[in-house]
C-alpha cells in the first residue's frame, strides 16, 4: 500500500485545526469560568445592589459557557447562582453568600 504525501498532509492539517479549535474552546471556557468566579467574589464583597449586579453578570457568563459546553458542573453552578440572586433580592445576604460559595465550589472542579 502506497501512502500519498497529500493524504498524510491533509490528515495532519485536520488534526492541527481540530487541536487549535479545541484549544480555543478550552481558553473560552477558562475565561468564562474565571469571569464567573470573579463576579461572584466581587459580589460577595459588596452590598446588596452590588451583589445582585455581580451575580447577574456571573449568571450571564455561566449560562454562555453552559450553552456552549453542556457541562453538569456549570449547570449546577448556574442553579446556585440563580438561588443566590433570589436570596440577594430578598436581602438574605447570608443565604446568597452560601449559594454563591456553592457555585464557586462547582466551578472549581472545572478549573482543574
What residue ranges belong to the model's regions?
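Classic N-terminal secretory signal peptides
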Residues: 1-24
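Long, charged/polar, soluble alpha-helical segments
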Residues: 20-112
Amino acid at each position: 500500500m502506497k501512502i500519498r504525501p497529500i493524504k498524510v498532509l491533509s490528515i495532519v492539517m485536520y488534526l492541527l485545526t481540530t487541536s487549535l479549535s479545541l484549544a480555543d474552546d478550552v481558553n473560552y471556557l477558562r475565561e468564562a469560568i474565571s469571569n464567573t468566579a470573579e463576579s461572584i467574589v466581587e459580589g460577595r464583597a459588596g452590598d446588596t445592589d452590588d451583589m445582585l449586579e455581580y451575580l447577574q453578570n456571573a449568571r450571564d457568563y455561566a449560562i454562555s459557557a453552559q450553552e456552549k459546553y453542556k457541562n453538569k458542573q456549570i449547570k449546577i453552578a448556574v442553579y446556585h447562582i440563580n438561588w443566590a440572586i433570589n436570596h440577594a433580592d430578598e436581602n438574605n445576604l447570608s443565604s446568597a453568600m452560601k449559594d454563591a460559595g456553592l457555585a464557586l465550589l462547582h466551578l472549581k472542579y472545572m478549573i482543574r
